[in-house]
Amino acid sequence: MERIVEREVSMKILSFGSLNIDYVYKVSHFVKKGETLSAEELNVYTGGKGLNQSIALSRAGMETYHAGAIGMDGLFLLDQLKEAGVNTDLVKILEDVRTGNAIIQNDEEGDNCIILFGGANQAISKEQVDEVFEHFKNEDYLPVSYTHLTLPTIA
């Protein structure tokens, strides 16, 4: 009978993804060309597909590292990630670039329209990508969630 040897797997998950500030406006209808529309409510949230993915992975018990970039206006995004147990050592803080953001209109039917500003998400350099990958092995897992990342940067 063959003996199965269990070994400890120390796989890390690197979530290389967007970090955004979401400005969510509750409106009666979507603004039309030339129209000025008053919002009924404004809420500001942490966002970005990458940030949301990192938090979900960490809450599921995975050892999660987030890599990306923010401006000085997005430091609170790091706090949110850290509170969820995500390692943020690989997030670059840029002094001269704003954090990515989304302007989201939510109408009474629950539909939305979204405008994205890439900001620091678009300032990811090949050098940053190479530096981040130095911390991981082939056995580690890499989900990438960038709406505004140019493919040549990570290829």
Label the model's feature ranges.
Residues 31-32, 107:
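Acidic surface patches and DE-rich sequence motifs
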Residues 9-31:
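Positively charged, low-complexity intrinsically disordered leader regions
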Residues 20, 71, 108, 119, ...:
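Short, glycine/serine-rich, charged loops/turns that create anion-binding
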